[in-house]
Regions:
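Phosphate/pyrophosphate-binding catalytic cores of soluble transferases and nucleic-acid-acting enzymes
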Residues: 1-304
Length: 304
């Protein structure tokens, strides 16, 4: 028997968390967070992490997993999420997959096999070859090894060419093999995939309000504390939306008002990219908050 999963995706500030909590309370569910920044400890305000009060209402999984100077791959996330989903279902509860990181959601509900971690040696070896022979020579090798992948990569895209070759060198398998399941549903799940898609003017207003609230709650102080305890401002976790602008403010590159406006502008851009991602996903249903009650009635068959 397949495990029923309800996915609630959508852009930042679209209302995913509140909707998921409301539905999980009604359906006796638990939430599996799919947010690539909420996995970090100590980064609460800038990632709009569910509050302790919200987490006391409904269990939230895959939040506060790693430290800001650590990393997690989509493959590692996939493994953890599937283990948690199995556990939630075994206890007679409904798993809710909730978040704005589309790649994380896709990694869980599609039949994707991720390549193993590759030793840094291979990347250095390829980099040295590029320096000696030129990027064109290395790209030509990729065309012979994995023409499917090469056909999707610009001959000037050094990062993706390097990634494709390092996987092949390390595993003996073209990276295209690992991407075959990208449009195939994971066979153990029965998924309802919903995407909150509010009108742009409403979404942008919510973004403005959210950023203002983050400042009121202490985003500046949270960022300063992360730096004070020794985390480098160059960490990928701290070079994300909100934190990077506040770091520039703390360095004297912005006044606070300019930093806040920059966060709002970049958040709007990020939300637009998220919306595009979700609209291009397969087997999704776009809904507005106003339609949620009708949609809930349709999916209430998931109640145990």
């Amino acid at each position: 028997m397949k495990i029923p999963i309800i996915v609630i995706g959508g852009p930042t500030a679209s209302g995913k968390t509140q909707l998921a909590i409301d539905w999980a309370l009604k359906l006796d569910g638990e939430i599996v967070s799919c947010d690539s920044r909420q996995i970090y400890k100590f980064m609460d305000i800038g990632t709009a992490k569910p509050t302790l009060e919200e987490r006391s209402l409904i269990p939230h999984h895959l939040v506060d997993l790693i430290y800001p100077d650590e990393t997690m791959t989509a493959g590692e996330f996939q493994k953890l999420a599937r283990e948690i989903i199995k556990d939630i279902h075994s206890r007679g509860k409904v798993p809710f997959l909730v978040g704005g990181t589309g790649l994380y959601i896709r990694s869980v509900i599609r039949d994707i096999v991720f390549p193993p971690k590759v030793d840094e040696y291979y990347r250095k070896f390829i980099k040295d070859r590029i320096n000696r022979e030129g990027l064109g020579s290395v790209y030509n090798e990729l065309c012979k090894i994995d023409p499917v992948t090469a056909g999707k990569i610009s001959p000037n895209d050094e990062i993706r060419i390097t990634r494709a070759l390092e996987v092949y060198y390390a595993t003996g398998t073209p990276i295209s093999f690992y991407r075959k399941g990208i449009d195939v549903d994971y066979p153990e799940y029965e998924v309802i995939y919903l995407v909150l898609n509010p009108p742009r003017d409403i979404l942008y207003r919510r973004i403005e309000e959210r950023v203002d609230k983050m400042i009121q709650l202490g985003l500046v102080e949270e960022t300063r504390h992360l730096l004070d305890v020794g985390y480098s401002p160059e960490l990928s976790s701290l070079q994300t939306l909100g934190y990077r602008e506040i770091i520039k403010y703390l360095k004297g590159m912005y006044d606070l008002e300019s930093a806040v406006e920059e966060i709002k502008k970049e958040t709007r851009r990020y939300a637009k990219r998220q919306s595009t991602w979700f609209r291009n996903e397969i087997r999704v249903r776009l809904i507005t908050y106003e339609e949620a009650e009708d949609v809930f009635r349709e999916i209430s068959r998931y109640r145990k």
